[in-house]
Amino acid sequence: MTADFDKTYTDWSIDVGTYKYEGITLNEVEQNLYAIQDQEQDFVVISPSNAISIDNKQYNFVQVCSDQDTDLLHIEISVTNNGDRGAIIYGKNEQGPQEVLKIIEDFIVHNKMPALDSWEIVLDLRPKMESYVKDSEND
């Protein structure tokens, strides 16, 4: 069953850089995806007011921009493992607007995310562990 594309999801926002608004519909999400594909805008960030917890992970936002090598879309998902500081941003290239819309619809309506095993790690914002022991000057 497909979600109601005109229903307003009040705990979600859309940010396109020049403006951000709270309370979004899937119809607005779809319009933004096609605007990116048509190169009318650079990106869209879709985020919940609070991170969504799924399988011991916190999902913070989804960002979509044009794929550099094709006329398709690039999608990124920000994930923080429970107990970790800092997010990992996963990305996937060459996605059509309907594929991306399905991922976003599942996130907004059903609090579901695809398995990210095959996705590329675009950015790892977790703090690095120190692999050395500092010498103490006060010994």
Q: Which residues make up each language-model segment?
A:
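Generic secondary-structure microfeatures
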Residues: 48-50
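A short glycine-rich, His/Asp/Glu-containing loop-to-beta-strand
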Residues: 44-46
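Acidic, proline/glycine-rich low-complexity IDRs
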Residues: 1-41, 52-139
